């Protein structure tokens, strides 16, 4: 169907007369650029008429233009005799075009757009990302792996393969989540239910765990055995999309077990934020802060960062490249305490400046060397690699990312019989606090000084690592009492006064927070008494730890520390 088939004849005649007059006038304004061997012109419309402000693009390039008030466009700077494929997109429509080649000089191009539904279909059945799910649909009703992975070329990591190893893909099966939810260790041993006592002033309040009974760490279900909570709102969003507070993440099935899965992310149309703060509303975690466009029966809908993916039922959504996309699951308030706030930390930093800053995607979805994101034999197109976002999304388990998060400068010298070590750590490469998100995460700075015989020098000044850094053998990761410090957001449970606490589903308060905000520096000084005659070696190490070591032991998690910075300095005593 072309742009005019649906008009009555009289309306068509009037429309064509007005359009022709407009085109004549606009041709005079553009003076000579309307028809040439280096331009293509035409009209973008839907069955009701022209569409203004539509983006027309030479597919896979940055050569684009915007339609005028009458839907007219002119694409410039084309190579003579070199055919191109054009696409068009406008808000509220699927991307159109993408099928016909046009030679420069063509002046009668017509691209018809189809409007997509402006409602969310709650009856939509999610598509699995995996071919192993067994469903093989037709067209775009297919699994993601089929077109977005290269099974016969492991050197090429397309989006499915990158996502498969990412924490988002593993969020529903994250054993730290599941054991913290159930109150178990990795072997399934469960801690006793929380004990309570009735008080005159405060009513029923919780008690600390019974020290005479086996304890395998905290658990949401130990404190709230009859509630599902809202963990699923972020960790199993496909399952929780319509039941954010009623989905138990340990019982989800099907696509829900795929975590933050492909189909879920590409059904996101917008994010609901508080206009005053720029943050999600406190009572709207995860899926509650997203606006979705699940398509009606017989249709599909994929929103993405390109406005030229055609043909197909795809559309462009600017939110896909904005940090606000990440806000619903990277900001969390429990009992009026801000527990995690990566998005807000970014928002408060210079990185949020739209002119000079960086988005979450700039750092966590940087382009790699791939020049296509869908298999070429499945309709994929060659593109500039710098326009394709990686789906590897490195985060707290990525060693390379962590080792490029902060800078550490050390000055070590002797004054008389004292070794003075000054350590400065600067968050100069990260757009939020370090560490961020889960309050279980922390950095441990460890300073050791030893003489030529390998004997450790006695610390005579400076802070030491607190008890919750681990009481025991330093060679096994128990660093309490050693020279150094910990960078962390420490929560304390209000009723039991347990701290540091990872059970932030309970009422807590922020006991302390000395994490490194963007572009801030922490400087600390340590002194050691020395009787060495020749040389002292100072070892300075900054490590990232996923959780408090006591909790790691209780849950039996396998979460090795990651060394972020490490320096050894020899100090001459002469």
Give the positions of each predicted feature.
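Beta-strand-rich domain onsets/edges
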Residues: 25-39, 411-417
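A short, amphipathic beta-strand motif
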Residues: 38-47, 71-73, 111, 423
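A short, solvent-exposed beta-strand micro-motif common in secreted/extracellular proteins
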Residues: 80-93
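Primarily the internal scaffold of c-type cytochrome electron-transfer domains
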Residues: 123-127, 156-218, 244-530, 541-574
